[in-house]
């Protein structure tokens, strides 16, 4: 479980313990196969829970079936404080391994700034095109920065 550095202000040890227990419970339920990600909001909440407060950039993929239910989720690439190298071939390989009908792409910006960079936009385009060749949809690419999330889909960038 990550640190709670994304929470504003000071919290007592008791509050910290309560929050960590609640996060563990939510995390356990959200990792169960079959959890439906039928909206950006559901994926957003799952990702904030799992990525807020990370100190290095991570690129994660949520693998979904035809009903947008979670098959699996995993970190594919870990980078530095401001960059992660993403390889489309590996994303496709893992999506096919999981027999995914769709994937939600996600990465974090440890700086807290969620505006996508030019590199973020380019890799998203490449991944959408590459995954499309094997009939795998990309409903969204989300960028997590603290408790904020940027959705490529909501901004018309997919």
Residue spans for each PLM region:
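Active-site-proximal loop/helix of nucleotide/amide-processing enzymes and allied scaffolds
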Residues: 2-20, 42, 67, 77-158
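Long amphipathic N-terminal alpha/beta scaffold segment
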Residues: 17-75
């Amino acid at each position: 479980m990550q640190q709670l550095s994304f929470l504003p202000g000071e919290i007592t040890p008791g509050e910290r313990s309560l929050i960590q227990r609640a996060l563990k419970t939510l995390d356990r339920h959200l990792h169960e196969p079959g959890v439906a990600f039928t909206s950006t909001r559901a994926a957003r909440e799952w990702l904030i829970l799992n990525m807020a407060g990370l100190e290095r950039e991570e690129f994660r993929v949520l693998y979904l079936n035809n009903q947008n239910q979670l098959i699996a989720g995993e970190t594919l690439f870990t980078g530095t404080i401001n960059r992660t190298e993403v390889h489309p071939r590996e994303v496709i390989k893992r999506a096919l391994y999981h027999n995914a009908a769709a994937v939600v792409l996600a990465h974090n910006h440890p700086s807290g700034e969620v505006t996508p960079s030019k590199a973020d936009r380019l890799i998203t385009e490449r991944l959408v095109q590459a995954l499309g060749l094997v009939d795998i949809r990309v409903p969204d690419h989300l960028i997590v920065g603290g408790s904020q999330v940027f959705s490529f889909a909501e901004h018309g960038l997919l």
